[in-house]
């Protein structure tokens, strides 16, 4: 395993983590999302921003002043990893560090209009041993099969994927771009049921605040069949 992630314990009063990542082109505005998450979701949720030393070799000295000050004030945690795992580092390493707790994803270009983290956690099963993820999709995207990717935001139950070290293959992940595809492939390989989907549109939950496009979009210009074919190929490669 390339990264050495220490196990962590959440601060008193926290019940889950909100995980997000960012990169050079969005680092100057991610503070807006973090401040919004703190205000909307409150102290029950520990915010973790995962960044790569490969992309920010001088670490905090390269970050905007607002991020540094909020981090020092304890508003959120910066989790540094060595390699730039791109979008894959949003959930993976936070999930390793806080494996005993639910992990909720957030996007670095969004303002959240209400406490979505609390809503997602509410739908987790009471039995902690039961693996479940809860996400948002509107009707036209909601599917119940294994190939259902995560939606606009997702809550993963504790230790959702278990040990995933063997599936962290950088070159393969970079080729397929999308962390959502990787999550689908892992669910299929590990026989974890598909997500619970809450029927809400993107605009019900967030307002974008950054116009910089993502590096890659799994859904842009692809039919459902084309997307599923890509995921099938990805599963085959991961199982080798």
Predicted regions and their residues:
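Short loop->beta transition adjacent to catalytic acidic/histidine clusters or analogous donor-positioning motifs
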Residues: 13-17, 38-49, 74-77, 101
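Short beta-alpha junction loops
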Residues: 50-56, 139-141, 201-202
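Active-site-proximal specificity loops/subdomain of glycosyltransferases
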Residues: 50-101
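Conserved catalytic core of nucleotide-sugar-dependent glycosyltransferases
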Residues: 94-95, 106, 110-172, 176
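Short beta-strand/turn micro-motifs composed of small residues
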Residues: 20-22, 51-53, 135
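Short acidic, S/G/P-rich loop/turn micro-motifs used as interaction or catalytic elements
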Residues: 23-27, 54-56, 109-112
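C-terminal catalytic/acceptor-binding lobe
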Residues: 1-24, 28-33, 163, 170-240
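Short, acidic, metal-binding catalytic loop of nucleotide-sugar glycosyltransferases
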Residues: 32-45, 53, 69
């Amino acid at each position: 395993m390339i990264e050495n992630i220490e196990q962590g314990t959440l601060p008193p009063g926290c019940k889950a983590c909100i995980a997000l990542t960012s990169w050079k082109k969005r680092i100057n505005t991610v503070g807006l999302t973090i401040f919004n998450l703190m205000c909307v979701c409150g102290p029950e949720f520990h915010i973790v921003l995962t960044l790569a030393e490969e992309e920010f070799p001088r670490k905090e000295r390269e970050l905007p002043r607002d991020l540094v000050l909020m981090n020092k004030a304890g508003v959120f945690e910066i989790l540094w990893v060595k390699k730039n795992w791109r979008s894959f580092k949003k959930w993976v390493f936070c999930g390793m560090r806080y494996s005993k707790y639910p992990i909720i994803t957030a996007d670095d270009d969004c303002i959240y209009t209400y406490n979505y983290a609390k809503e997602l956690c509410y739908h987790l099963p009471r039995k902690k041993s039961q693996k479940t993820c809860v996400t948002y999709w509107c009707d036209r995207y909601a599917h119940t099969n294994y190939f259902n990717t995560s939606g606009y935001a997702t809550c993963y139950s504790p230790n959702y994927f278990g040990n995933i070290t063997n599936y962290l293959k950088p070159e393969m992940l970079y080729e397929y771009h999308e962390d959502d595809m990787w999550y689908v492939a892992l669910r299929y390989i590990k026989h974890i049921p598909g997500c619970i989907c809450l029927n809400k549109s993107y605009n019900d939950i967030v307002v974008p605040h950054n116009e910089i496009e993502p590096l890659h979009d799994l859904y842009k210009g692809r039919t459902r069949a084309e997307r599923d074919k890509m995921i099938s190929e990805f599963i085959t490669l991961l199982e080798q």
